[in-house]
């Protein structure tokens, strides 16, 4: 029997979790745009959330996830992932993954925004993502191919099925890589905005490639802005993990006033969307916002990554304060997938931030993303292993009649427009203005043979921006990370409804899998928003 071939686009935690789950008999190729360590996962300062403590439970973790997600989560997916995630964390512990431990040898469990218990597993203080990638790279078998400096240029579709991927290397050479199954694990689209936490290679490629191939994209209006990026003189230097607030740090203005004290019952540990809006409001008044970490005695030991970021930015760590501002962090929406990571295109999977499974709802709970990456990576691999080998009689060769529409703008112009019109606060006239601008940009059609990687990335970002803006315009309510100043409350009429895009058009669809609890929608969500 011929070997089953798998092509994986991306090299973050989801991609490597998937690759590590295949036995040596599978022909797995991991393709990444730059170095294998160019991914958002490497930058993850938070940890992995799992209900491990004796007084904690999966039910409590589920409730926190639903509360943060503002009643837009797929309940079955949440329950599944949290159950499997706890077992995966247990497996990491048994295999000696270097989670932080106390002087007695017990695992240190941290607390982050919107969690009701200490359940965050960290490694290396604030270097969990980097250490997880190192660990997964050691776990994958030697027969797996890791191809660096090669970019996915198009998905190969034959008779409605994905049968491989066309790639372009750093020298501009095109290649065709046929596969029984293709897995998109290329991250989100943080580079659409001026201030973001993403690797520079994360430009919406997976979203746009899936859309071009005919797959469904869902929930693109739900873009999470992390409350605390270190921003100095308009320059963003990196993320300041909310674990700092979990350890006793607090948000203050230049006069030392605690800005979250009366804004939410959880104070500085309110859900990310809430904290981002409060900081945005303070900055709009002309107030500077800081994290005061003076109460954390061992800050440099506990947060070595953040300490290095402060040094790079010229921040005196002994001042006990870090200047912060919100920035784009995570896309809750993405390519529509089922519990196995299958998209609506046969032969095509999506996992990690590229995918939208319904786990995060309208706003992701802190440290649920690495959990998602580990669970869906392993789960997608297990599903692929169970499938029969595709009867391969490939007819698609090197197709050179593929064209990209490339807008005649610079990337920073698109970032500036998205930041001013589509970030934390949104309203109809501004969204319409942005949508018109996006759809009337002059562009050129560039053949895939001639296109540069940068042009390809700009095209992906432009396509994603158009769909994202249309979603934000259509959803006339505020829910989670999507906040409309002209519709400042969650609406029961939007409960369970999703905005779905395909090449054939856009539709609003009721998803019966979304947790339907009207009291949660009408009371808890609205109480957590401010107008």
Curated annotation (Swiss-Prot):
This is L-aspartate oxidase. Monomer. Homodimer. FAD binds at residues 11-14, 33, 40-47, 151-152, 205, 353, 369-370. The active site is at 272 (proton donor/acceptor). Induction: Expression is repressed in the presence of nicotinic acid. It catalyses: L-aspartate + O2 = iminosuccinate + H2O2; fumarate + L-aspartate = iminosuccinate + succinate. Binds 1 FAD per subunit. GO terms for molecular function: L-aspartate oxidase activity; nucleotide binding; steroid dehydrogenase activity, acting on the CH-CH group of donors. The record marks 112 as: Important in orienting the L-aspartate substrate. Belongs to the FAD-dependent oxidoreductase 2 family. NadB subfamily. Its EC number is 1.4.3.16, 1.5.99.-. Pathway: Cofactor biosynthesis; NAD(+) biosynthesis; iminoaspartate from L-aspartate (oxidase route): step 1/1. It is found in: Cytoplasm. Its cofactor is FAD. The gene is nadB. Catalyzes the oxidation of L-aspartate to iminoaspartate, the first step in the de novo biosynthesis of NAD(+). Can use either oxygen or fumarate as electron acceptors, which allows the enzyme to be functional under aerobic and anaerobic conditions. One of its GO terms (biological process) is 'de novo' NAD biosynthetic process from L-aspartate. Keywords: Cytoplasm, FAD, Flavoprotein, Nucleotide-binding, Oxidoreductase, Pyridine nucleotide biosynthesis.
């Amino acid at each position: 029997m011929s070997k089953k071939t798998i092509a994986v686009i991306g090299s973050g935690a989801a991609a490597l979790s998937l690759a590590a789950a295949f036995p040596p008999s599978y022909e797995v190729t991991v393709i990444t745009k730059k170095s294998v360590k160019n991914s958002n996962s490497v930058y993850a300062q938070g940890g992995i959330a799992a209900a491990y403590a004796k007084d904690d439970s999966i039910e409590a973790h589920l409730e926190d996830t639903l509360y943060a997600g503002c009643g837009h989560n797929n309940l079955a997916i949440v329950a599944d992932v949290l159950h499997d995630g706890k077992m995966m964390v247990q497996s990491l512990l048994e295999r000696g993954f270097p989670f932080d431990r106390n002087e007695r040898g017990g695992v240190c469990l941290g607390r982050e925004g919107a969690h009701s218990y200490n359940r965050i597993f960290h490694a290396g203080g604030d270097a969990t993502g980097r250490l997880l990638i190192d660990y997964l790279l050691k776990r994958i078998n030697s027969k797996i191919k890791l191809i660096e400096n090669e970019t996915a240029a198009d998905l190969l579709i034959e008779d409605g099925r994905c049968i491989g991927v066309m790639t372009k290397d750093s020298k501009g050479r095109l290649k065709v890589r046929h596969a029984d199954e293709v897995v998109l694990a290329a991250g989100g689209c943080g580079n659409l905005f001026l201030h973001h936490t993403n690797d520079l290679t994360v430009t919406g490629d997976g979203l746009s490639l899936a859309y071009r191939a005919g797959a469904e994209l869902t929930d693109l209006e739900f873009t999470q802005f992390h409350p605390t990026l270190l921003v100095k003189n308009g320059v963003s230097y990196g993320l300041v993990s909310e674990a700092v607030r979990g350890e006793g740090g607090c948000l203050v203005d230049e006069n030392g006033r605690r800005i979250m004290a009366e804004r939410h019952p959880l104070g500085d540990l309110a859900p990310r969307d809430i904290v981002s809006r409060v900081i945005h409001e303070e900055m709009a008044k002309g107030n500077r916002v800081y994290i005061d970490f003076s109460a954390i005695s061992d800050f440099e030991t506990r947060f070595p990554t953040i300490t290095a970021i402060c040094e790079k930015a010229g921040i005196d760590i002994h001042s006990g304060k870090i200047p912060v501002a919100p920035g784009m962090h995570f896309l809750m929406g993405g390519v529509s997938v089922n519990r196995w990571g299958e998209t609506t295109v046969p032969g095509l999977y999506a996992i990690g931030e590229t995918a939208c499974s319904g786990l995060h709802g309208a706003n992701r709970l802190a440290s649920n993303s690495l959990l998602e990456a580990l669970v869906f990576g392993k789960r997608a691999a297990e599903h692929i292993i169970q499938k029969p080998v595709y009867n391969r009689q490939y007819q698609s060769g090197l197709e050179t009649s593929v064209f990209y529409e490339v807008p005649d703008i610079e990337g920073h112009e698109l970032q500036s427009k998205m930041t001013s019109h589509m970030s934390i606060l949104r309203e109809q006239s501004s969204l319409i203005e942005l949508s018109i601008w996006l759809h009337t940009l002059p562009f050129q059609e560039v053949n895939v043979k001639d296109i540069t990687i940068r042009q390809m990335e700009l095209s992906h970002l432009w396509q994603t921006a158009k769909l994202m803006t249309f979603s934000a315009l259509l959803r006339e309510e505020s829910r989670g990370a999507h906040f409309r100043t002209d519709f400042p409350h969650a609406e029961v009429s939007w409960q369970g409804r999703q905005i779905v895009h395909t090449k054939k058009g856009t539709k609003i669809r009721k998803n019966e899998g979304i947790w339907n609890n009207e009291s949660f929608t009408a009371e808890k969500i609205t109480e957590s928003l401010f107008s």
